[in-house]
Design a protein with these regions (language model features):
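N-terminal beta1-alpha1 cap of cysteine-dependent amidohydrolase-like domains
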Residues: 1-199, 207-219
Length: 219
């Protein structure tokens, strides 16, 4: 997470604050300890990752951030965990998860071919990853009047990606009716790149890795 640590430092410099990192091991985070562990933090960041280890702790932390109005930022896997948390607790889809974690789940996250049989989406061609890796610089179009558009001050952005799994767009209308907005989409409107929560001080998830492009004078 060196690039992530440096990006947080860059952001602190830009805002004239010192960023004090509190590292929490999500696989050791128990539900009855959430408040004790997180009540003193100013924000919660769930970074990229993979695999089942620690996912329930991450989901519990996201729920706490959403309900307690604590600023939250989810990057790549972190955004996917936010989708799962919202699906379980706001859409009442109790077995919502990712097919990366549970093949028998209700797939709010999955490989595109697992939930979208129509249309063609370029996914990369790395042979050792089965041709499913979405890798490199991709464009996202930003929703008008969204928090993310105010942050970037642009109609579209280009950010670096490295992931295989995507948000299931078949449930987009249900998420948005409950207040979770898909505020950044791929140019063909098929792939969610950014989500944000209405009526929350700062709750944003991104499928890309903004830390890869962060620089001291351009965080």
């Amino acid at each position: 997470y060196k690039s992530l640590d440096e990006a947080l430092t860059h952001g602190g410099i830009a805002n004239n604050v010192k960023v004090n990192l509190v590292r929490i091991e999500s696989d050791k985070l128990k539900k009855n300890e959430i408040s004790k562990k997180l009540k003193s933090v100013s924000g919660i960041l769930i970074p990229g990752g993979f695999g089942k280890r620690g996912t329930e702790g991450k989901i519990s932390a996201i729920k706490y951030a959403r309900e307690k109005k604590i600023p939250f930022f989810g990057i790549c896997f972190g955004m996917q965990m936010a989708i799962i948390e919202f699906a379980r607790h706001k859409l009442n889809i109790k077995n919502a998860s990712s097919t990366e974690l549970d093949k028998k789940c209700y797939p709010v996250i999955g490989l595109i071919h697992e939930w979208n049989k129509n249309g063609k989406v370029f996914k990369g061609t790395e042979k050792n990853l089965g041709g499913t890796m979405r890798l490199g610089l991709y464009t996202a179009k930003l929703k008008n009047n969204s928090a993310i558009k105010k942050i970037y001050k642009s109609n579209e952005i280009k950010e670096r990606h490295r992931h295989r799994y995507e948000v299931n767009t078949n449930q987009r209308s249900k998420f948005e009716k409950k207040g979770l907005i898909f505020s950044g989409m791929s140019p063909d409107n098929k792939l969610p790149e950014i989500i944000e929560l209405k009526n929350h001080p700062w709750f944003i998830g991104v499928q890309f890795h903004p830390e890869f492009k962060s620089r001291p004078l351009a965080p």
